[in-house]
Amino acid sequence: MENTLGLEIIEVVEQAAIASAKWMGKGEKNTADQVAVEAMRERMNKIYMRGRIVIGEGERDDAPMLYIGEEVGICTQPNADQLCNPDELVEIDIAVDPCEGTNLVAYGQPGSMAVLAISEKGGLFAAPDFYMKKLAAPPAAKGKVDINKSATENLKILSECLDRSIDELVVVVMKRDRHQGLIKEIRDAGARVQLISDGDVGAAISCGFAGTNVHALMGIGAAPEGVISAAAMRALGGHFQGQLIYDPEVVKTGLIGESKQANLDRLSSMGINDPDKVYDAHELASGENVLFAGCGITSGNLMQGVRFFHGGARTQSLVISSQSQTARFVDTIHMAGQPKTVQLH
């Protein structure tokens, strides 16, 4: 899969990032997201595959494209019988976030990315549009920290695993009212807190790389992004755990349903009979071959954002493979055409 689709999915996230970056700083988060969705879908439909969106822009009735269940790729087109050889057909599941951090793009802030994860059919957890409690940590702490432990306990373990004092550790937490107690506990334990307004996928993945100065991600964020983070962290050998949040009182916002019981009923209808289950990276991204791809829209901890020049753009992308256990950074110059001749006076 890596050999056949690796470069293709890099181009998918590159095109989404370039489209969205044109709206950077214009205060139009919905437009920044919309153009990224359109660009991502257009490029996906040029790939020789039969892809199915398992995590996307929402339910079919709420999203015109890249909705959950939508099929993409050349082999889903009306004339697929003429274009595709069934013996060569690649069937994959896809999780997408064409503009991870729409507010970051709209206000010109760092850390937004176009991201996706793919696996063979059935290889990605089809997370509902709920919240998820998350814990990400470096490979050295894999299986040693635990989401059921307190932040204080996990920081002590992390300190030992990384051979660092607690006051050297940096924990990323989303700046939300629900995290006030968590933030206080982390600070009281002696660690430093980096607050982010949006975009916890990049924060989770940063834990998998040495030198990013991010040692853990803690707190509650969106579940679909948790699956994408898990796909990357699984390939990196890092620690990732997620637990679905089905009680609206925990987050006091409208991303999940109106009542706890309604959410439990929805989970049951999806075949999730243990709503309190803690999932690890292998359970969220269980496929034999899992690929993650991301491209910076605005510059962040991992990647430079899109930089435009006359007649083109420059992007920095990242592709991570569970099969080859590699992470490749890709620096690309996109040349739209020959530069115009400018006459100086």
Swiss-Prot record:
- In terms of superkingdom, the source organism counts as Bacteria
Q: What pathway, per the record?
A: Carbohydrate biosynthesis; Calvin cycle
One GO term under biological process is: glycerol metabolic process
Keywords, comma-separated and alphabetical = Calvin cycle, Carbohydrate metabolism, Hydrolase, Manganese, Metal-binding
Tell me which InterPro entries the record gives.
FBPase_class-2/SBPase
* Pfam family for this entry, one: FBPase_glpX
> Signal sequence: where?
none
Q: Which reaction does it catalyse?
A: beta-D-fructose 1,6-bisphosphate + H2O = beta-D-fructose 6-phosphate + phosphate; D-sedoheptulose 1,7-bisphosphate + H2O = D-sedoheptulose 7-phosphate + phosphate
Q: Which residues does the annotation say bind substrate?
A: E100, G101, T102, Y131, R176, D177, R178, D198, G199, D200
CDD domains, sorted: FBPase_glpX
Give the EC number(s) under which this enzyme is classified.
3.1.3.11, 3.1.3.37
Statement: the UniProt record of this protein carries the keyword Manganese: yes
What's any one GO cellular component for it? cytosol
> Binding of Mn(2+) 2: at which residues?
D97, E100, E225
What Gene3D superfamilies would the database entry show? 3.40.190.90, Fructose-1,6-Bisphosphatase, subunit A, domain 1
GO MF entry, a single one: metal ion binding
Required cofactors, per record? Mn(2+)
Give the top-level enzyme category. hydrolase
Binding of Mn(2+) 1 occurs at D33, E57
The subunit field of the Swiss-Prot or TrEMBL record says: Homotetramer.
Question: Which purpose does this protein serve, as stated in its record?
Answer: Catalyzes the hydrolysis of fructose 1,6-bisphosphate (Fru 1,6-P2) and sedoheptulose 1,7-bisphosphate (Sed 1,7-P2) to fructose 6-phosphate and sedoheptulose 7-phosphate, respectively.
Q: Which family does it belong to?
A: Belongs to the FBPase class 2 family.
**What's the protein here called?**
D-fructose 1,6-bisphosphatase class 2/sedoheptulose 1,7-bisphosphatase
Organism for this UniProt entry: Nostoc sp. (strain PCC 7120 / SAG 25.82 / UTEX 2576)
